Amino acid sequence: MKKLLLVFATCFLFSCATDNKKKDIEKSDPMSGIMVGKDSKSDAMLQFTKAYQENNMSSAKSIFTEDVVFNVNDTKMSFDQVNAGFSSGHDFFDNIKHTEFNVSTMYYNDGKIFTNYWYTWTATSKKTNNEITL
């Protein structure tokens, strides 16, 4: 019985030490942090994508500062460039929708903040009248 208690106590001590070590690593790792889905940045992303779907991108301009820089697939773009790019999709498609979407903002330990948005894109081609899902 004494050996069983000794083994249990030893395991308990090692498990506590491992947990603390993990927390120390997470705090010092710049690629660690917290991810949330209900914050002002995630809400702004939802407002932005709603404006895109409604083809009313100019209504989303107030979300951003005048010097905003969008990083779209390694390309830096201004709001006006993003507005023109996203709006041009409506020249070729009707009924653009985002379904099955998830949004979250990652607050990294090094102070960087990124908001991510995953979705299924659907629209109807103006040329073929076929619905497309991506």
Give the predicted meaning of each segment.
Residues 1-4:
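Positively charged n-region of N-terminal signal peptides that target proteins for export
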Residues 6-8:
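Sec-dependent N-terminal signal peptides
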Residues 17-57, 62:
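Short, low-complexity N-terminal intrinsically disordered segments enriched in polar/charged residues
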Residues 48, 59-61, 68, 82, ...:
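Hydrophobic pocket/interface hotspot
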Residues 50-53, 57, 65-69, 87-95:
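Sec-exported extracytoplasmic/periplasmic mature domains
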Residues 87-133:
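Surface-exposed, charged secondary-structure patches
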